[in-house]
């Protein structure tokens, strides 16, 4: 967007505020020869611009150029897990920036479990959302988190993958009577937990 941006031109007794047209241009006619200062109003979504000085020469058109850059920041995700398998995990960052542009980006963790979103447009009043993508089935899926992005700052978030746990209750009974017969006892039986054909533990 380049229209309706406000500039102030000062110098040689002139102090005039003007707005850009649809082409992003302003034009002030009939200025006396001399040096003038052109200043752009600060906008939350743009990096601040330095004022520029321009020399007006009689009979010539003097030009000064401004190039607005949208403010950006970074987001760093640190992933940890109970089994320390933290590389190659994908995170998704999404939302609407302060400038109204949609943000929809992905980053993958490195060997240290760190995923970095660089040069992200700053967020508005509503922060972005960051979530882990395609969480491995062995983990409890971590909740998504809010992630505001501020200009020239690094926002930090951490995600912990917790292994799914389970419990097994075994009740031994007699196949015919459901209770022990005669002097027999159902106590003291040993059970094994297997992964495939591998015995993992006994109880």
Model feature map: region roles:
Residues 1-203:
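Solvent-exposed loop/turn and edge beta-strand elements of beta-rich ligand-binding domains
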């Amino acid at each position: 967007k380049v229209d309706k941006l406000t500039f102030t031109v000062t110098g040689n007794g002139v102090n005039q505020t003007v707005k850009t047209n649809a082409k992003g241009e302003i034009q002030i006619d009939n200025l006396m020869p001399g040096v003038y200062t052109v200043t752009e109003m600060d906008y939350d979504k743009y990096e601040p611009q330095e004022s520029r000085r321009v020399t007006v020469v009689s009979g010539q058109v003097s030009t000064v150029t401004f190039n607005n850059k949208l403010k950006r920041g970074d987001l760093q995700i640190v992933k940890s897990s109970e089994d320390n398998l933290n590389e190659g995990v994908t995170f998704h960052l999404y939302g609407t920036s302060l400038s109204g542009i949609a943000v929809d980006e992905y980053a993958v963790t490195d060997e240290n479990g760190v995923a970095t979103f660089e040069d992200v447009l700053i967020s508005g009043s509503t922060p972005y959302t960051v979530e882990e993508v395609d969480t491995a089935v062995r983990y409890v899926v971590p909740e998504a988190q809010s992630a505001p992005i501020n200009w020239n700052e690094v926002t930090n978030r951490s995600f912990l993958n917790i292994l799914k746990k389970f419990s097994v209750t075994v009740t031994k009974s007699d196949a015919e009577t459901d209770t022990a017969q005669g002097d027999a006892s159902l106590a003291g039986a040993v059970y094994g937990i297997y992964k495939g054909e591998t015995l993992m533990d006994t109880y």
